[in-house]
Every structure is written in C-alpha cells, then in structure tokens.
Amino acid sequence: MNNPSKAAQKKPKSNLIDGWEVVIGIEIHTQLATQSKIFSGSSTEFGQDPNTQASLVDLAMPGVLPVLNEEVVNLAIRFGLGIDAYIDQASVFARKNYFYPDSPKGYQISQMDNPIVGLGHIDIQLEDGTVKRIGVTRAHLEEDAGKSIHDQFEGQSGIDLNRAGTPLLEIVSEPDMRSVEEAVAYIKSIHTLVRWLGISDGNMAEGSFRADCNVSLRRPGDAFGTRCELKNLNSFRFIEQAINVEIERQMEILEWGGTIDQETRLFDPNKMETRSMRSKEEANDYRYFPDPDLLPVIIADEQIKAIKATMPELPAARRERFIAEFAITEYDAHVLTLSREMADFYEAVVAAAGGAAHGKIAANWVMGEFSGALNKAGLELADSPVSAEQLGGMIARIVDNTISGKIAKQVFGFMWDEGKSADTIIQEKSLKQETDTGAIEAIIKDVLAANEKMVEEYKSGKEKAFNGLVGQVMKASKGKANPAQVNELMKKLIG
C-alpha cells in the first residue's frame, strides 16, 4: 500500500557525524482506541480517580481468567494493513515475566514468537523532500502496566492500577534510521497513521503514544554498535533532544577509547542529559512462554477482508492524489494530510469553492488564514466556527470576482466572529467588489489629476510610482475596486 514516490530515488545526503554513523531503531507503544481493556471489561477512560477502573482481572485475583477483547485484534489488523504488513492468522499470547509493584500478576501478557503483525514498512518524508522507506519488524498486542505514584505520600509510594490492562500495540521498527531527523519523521508518520486509521487518539500528553529509541554509533561499514534504549519519550521535542544528547554522550565515550554499556536510560529535559536506569534486558531474561489461559488467536480470511473493505485512503496515497488532482505542491500536500480531519476538511473546501481548479487557492486559505485563526483561538479543527462549506463558499466569491483577496480577509474575520456565510456578510457589510468600468475610471481620473508628479515619474520609468497610484485608487474605493481592472484601466488612461 505504501509505494515510494519519485522522491525516494533521490540520493540521500550524508548523515555521518565526525565520521560516526548513527543507527536508530524505534519501539512505539500506542494505546488502542477501545472502550474497555484488553482482557477485562474495565473502562479505559483517562483521568479517573485512582483504582476506580481496575477489575478483579486487572488486580490478578485468584481464580479469574482473562478474556480477549475482539476489538483490539481488529484494530491491530487495521494497522497491519496500513503498513502493508504480514498478518499472522494464528497469533499467540505469551507471558513476559518480571516484577514491578505496578504489575500485580508478576508478568505481562504480551506476544513473542507469533505477533499479530509481521514485516511491513512505512515511507517517511524528510524536510528536503527525500522519501525513505523504514521497515517495521513487527507490531504486537500487549497490556499496559499500572502507575507508581511517588509524590503524593510522604515517605510512601502509591499504586494506581487504572492503566493496568489497557490495550497497547507495540510497533517495532528495523534499525533503519540514520539521523535524528529520520527518527522524528518516522515517529510522526506512525503517529499520523494510527490517528488516520482511527486505532488510537495518539494523545502523547495522556500517555496514549510513547516512544522508546534505541541509539548506537558505528564507523561506516562496521557491525552495529552497542545500543542504549531511551525510555518513554512522550513528545516530539523530547525525542529530538534525547537522541541528540545520547549521540553526543556515546560519541565522547567512543572518541576517548571507551565502550558503551547496553542499558536503558532516561532523558532529563531539565538537565539535558540521559542517565542510566537499568541494564538492558534480553528476551531470555523475561522467560517468555505461551500464556496457558489464552487460546491462540485464529484470524479468518473473511475477517481480514472485511477490515480491508473499511480502510480509508492512506496518507501517502492521498498526498499523491492531492498533488495530481489539485495541482498543489508536495509541501502543501504534506501539511494538508497531517491528519485525516484536515485532509477531509480541505477536500470539502475545494468542492464548495467550485472544484479541483481551485485547489491551490483553497490550500492557501486552509493553511494560512484559517489555520492561523484556529491557532490564535486555541481551537481544534472540529470546533471551528467556520465550516468547510462556508470557507469554500467565500473562496468561490474570490474566484468569481465578487470580492478581492484583500476584502476576503475582512469577510473571513466577520465569518469567524459571527458564524454567517460569506454571501450574507458581503451583502450586510456592502463589501462587494466594484467591477463597473465607468465607476472605476472615474476614481482613476480623480487620482491621476491629484497626483500629476507620480504620473510623470511613472512615465519616466519608475514602476514604484505606478504601484503608488494603484494604491491610491484602492484606498479611494475602500478596497472594493477590482485590482486587475484598476491596473488595466490605469495604463490605458495614462497612455
């Protein structure tokens, strides 16, 4: 489903840093958008009082058994289809054995040998337009742990098990990234995809989307170096900062002849450093074995086919279509497909504006004035007081010369504040563009008569003088004169 564009054929720029090649692999944990947990009926709603959403299953009480939530399987399949991956139709759950206070069972139900999603890939686009394909090793289902609370009780720690059993999809990349830019672009691409497919809200502030970054250095052509894992990074800014800091740390050690210890490290954004958390475990440290309480997940061809039928057009395909159909730039197409909601909004604006021929002006308005108003007001797209149909209707009035681009900004401001259509605003505020040739000629003649010096300057070759005269006409018409007509008539009258 992800076909690399022509940009993928570009020769990549060198990513060497002082002769070292950076190697990065990413593990992403994204919370699946289900109403209940993966193995119990407890709610997954965020922000509730501690331990109010933990059932007997989540608490690991004796005699209770996990029951798989079918929806998490469907969402995992949906993701697999989105990255053109292999779907294992006989997937197995395993117990990952370790002890943490916020994990009541003493193990985590995860997947090891038979993950539900196998090899796949996703294409990322870098700032210079280069497209690179990143391999996805696997994506497997697992349950989240609870949360330890250390700052609410003096001398004691609390345990909140509301998150215990929350369904996660862990997405593991190949170590294909060779720079911080590529790593951030990959994580952003996965973030866009899981929201686009509706499998996760991707809310990083609430812990719905977290990244672990494995970083190592090597000389070009050498075997992979020893990697360190940067754990639980939950913002794109922190991800970029943490990887840069870790690269510098490892480079300094290696340049002085030292060796890198394989370990898990935490990033401290205040001190701008990473510090050791624990030695990095290998799979055999967790003593994985199939969970005896859960049967293998058998996925029928019909189930995959039914999910495939509900798949939306993917971001990469939509970008390519926008470029071809609406004649917009790669950059515009990239920005307009950062979310499915924005892409849908843009297409609705184009339709209301009169069709594909107006794709570029629609892109300019959506990305410019409209997005600026959203940001200034601190609103999400869904809360916009101006609908796609209203914005497209206003653009249609620019296209048919009812209003100029300058007047359109005034119209948009009134639409934003009053929630009315462009046509209503134009009529109520008397903002219709003046296109009557006689009326415009009369204004031009008055301006020329009052500015004889500027007329002579223009005749002597000073183009600025002409622009000044046009500005005077626009001012006299209160911005209503058609700029193209003003230019044409002005030149005709000056001779």
Curated annotation (Swiss-Prot):
The keyword Ligase applies. SMART domains: GatB_Yqey. Coiled coil: none annotated. GO terms for molecular function: asparaginyl-tRNA synthase (glutamine-hydrolyzing) activity; ATP binding; glutaminyl-tRNA synthase (glutamine-hydrolyzing) activity. It catalyses: L-glutamyl-tRNA(Gln) + L-glutamine + ATP + H2O = L-glutaminyl-tRNA(Gln) + L-glutamate + ADP + phosphate + H(+); L-aspartyl-tRNA(Asn) + L-glutamine + ATP + H2O = L-asparaginyl-tRNA(Asn) + L-glutamate + ADP + phosphate + 2 H(+). InterPro entries: Asn/Gln-tRNA_amidoTrfase_suB/E, Asn/Gln-tRNA_Trfase_suB/E_cat, Asn/Gln_amidotransferase, Asn/Gln_tRNA_amidoTrase-B-like, GatB, GatB_C_1, GatB_Yqey_C_2, Gln-tRNA_amidoTrfase_suB_CS. It holds the Pfam family GatB_Yqey. Its EC number is 6.3.5.-. SUPFAM superfamilies: GatB/YqeY motif (SSF89095), Glutamine synthetase/guanido kinase (SSF55931). It is an enzyme of class 6 (ligase). Keywords: ATP-binding, Ligase, Nucleotide-binding, Protein biosynthesis. GO terms for biological process: glutaminyl-tRNAGln biosynthesis via transamidation; translation. The keyword Ligase applies. Gene3D superfamilies: 1.10.10.410, GatB domain, N-terminal subdomain (1.10.150.380). Allows the formation of correctly charged Asn-tRNA(Asn) or Gln-tRNA(Gln) through the transamidation of misacylated Asp-tRNA(Asn) or Glu-tRNA(Gln) in organisms which lack either or both of asparaginyl-tRNA or glutaminyl-tRNA synthetases. The reaction takes place in the presence of glutamine and ATP through an activated phospho-Asp-tRNA(Asn) or phospho-Glu-tRNA(Gln). Belongs to the GatB/GatE family. GatB subfamily. Heterotrimer of A, B and C subunits. PANTHER family: GLUTAMYL-TRNA GLN AMIDOTRANSFERASE SUBUNIT B MITOCHONDRIAL AND PROKARYOTIC PET112-RELATED, GLUTAMYL-TRNA(GLN) AMIDOTRANSFERASE SUBUNIT B, MITOCHONDRIAL. This is Aspartyl/glutamyl-tRNA(Asn/Gln) amidotransferase subunit B. It comes from Acinetobacter baylyi (strain ATCC 33305 / BD413 / ADP1).
